[in-house]
């Protein structure tokens, strides 16, 4: 058993991460999984198992998800206060939003550093490469959600580059029904709709992914059936939402791969 930095073996850190998940202590879950990544690198090769990478994804998604929800709420309150001319309250909300944004930036920086320095370079399996490149795109997209000006453009450019690199591999190497390929298409299409304001491109991408998966539904293995069909449902829901009203940005109704991936 390889010993993880900070005490405990890699296997023990995985167990502790699962405990933290059950206890909904996601910041600690992140810490345990970061130790697993360090232990994997120290053990040579640096690849995580499928279970480990899913635990890492769940940990970070919950930590970032709480702050993304907070940011949306505080931003909405700030706009309402500005709208009714309550300058003092609006300033307080703006200051509080900046605090949440600092936390969002730090969380994204942490996982992006892990991805760039450890996880993407060590990924040998095709599904792992696509998984980590998609994850890289996701966290740059989360930055693009609240950054402004040149920082927003940089985050959007980095998101596009990561998703495109993932898609180039996925289209060649993964079946249309593979849950990672479908999850990538889902999040890539949300990026086009929400960040790049390209509803036509978003709909085209989502529809193509859905149609290709439908045509090969009979090839779906039992182990990935639930994940794949759940993401297909989200793709279809988004298509319905986007095509029903292209003028509406979808707001809180927007769906990405958070739900299906959280169920791994």
Curated annotation (Swiss-Prot):
InterPro entries: 14-3-3 (IPR000308), 14-3-3_CS (IPR023409), 14-3-3_dom_sf (IPR036815), 14-3-3_domain (IPR023410). It comes from the Eukaryota. Pfam families: 14-3-3. Residues 252-264 have a biased composition (Basic and acidic residues). PROSITE patterns: 1433_1 (PS00796), 1433_2 (PS00797). Residues 245-264 are annotated as: Disordered. GO terms for biological process: protein localization; signal transduction. SUPFAM superfamilies: 14-3-3 protein. One of its GO terms (cellular component) is cytoplasm. Is associated with a DNA binding complex that binds to the G box, a well-characterized cis-acting DNA regulatory element found in plant genes. Belongs to the 14-3-3 family. This is 14-3-3-like protein GF14-A. It comes from Oryza sativa subsp. japonica (Rice). The lineage of its organism: Eukaryota, Viridiplantae, Streptophyta, Embryophyta, Tracheophyta.
């Amino acid at each position: 058993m390889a010993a993880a930095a900070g005490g405990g073996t890699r296997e023990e850190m995985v167990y502790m991460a699962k405990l933290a998940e059950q206890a909904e202590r996601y910041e600690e879950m992140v810490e345990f999984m970061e130790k697993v990544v360090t232990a994997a690198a120290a053990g040579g090769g640096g690849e995580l198992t499928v279970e480990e990478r899913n635990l890492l994804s769940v940990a970070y998604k919950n930590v970032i998800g709480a702050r993304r929800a907070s940011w949306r709420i505080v931003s909405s309150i700030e706009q309402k206060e500005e709208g009714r001319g309550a300058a003092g309250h609006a300033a307080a909300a703006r200051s509080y939003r900046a605090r949440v944004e600092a936390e969002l930036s730090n969380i994204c920086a942490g996982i992006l550093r892990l991805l760039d320095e450890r996880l993407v370079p060590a990924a040998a399996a095709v599904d792992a490469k696509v998984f980590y490149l998609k994850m890289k795109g996701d966290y740059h997209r989360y930055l693009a959600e609240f950054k402004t000006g040149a920082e927003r453009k940089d985050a959007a450019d980095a998101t596009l580059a990561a998703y495109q690199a993932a898609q180039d591999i996925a289209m060649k190497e993964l079946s249309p029904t593979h849950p990672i390929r479908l999850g990538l298409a889902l999040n890539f299409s949300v990026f086009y709709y929400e960040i790049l304001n390209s509803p036509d491109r978003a709909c085209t991408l989502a529809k193509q992914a859905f149609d290709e998966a439908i045509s090969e539904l009979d090839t779906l293995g039992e182990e990935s059936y639930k994940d794949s069909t759940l993401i297909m449902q989200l793709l279809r829901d988004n298509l319905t939402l986007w095509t029903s009203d292209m003028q509406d940005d979808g707001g809180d109704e927007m769906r990405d791969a958070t739900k299906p991936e959280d169920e791994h």
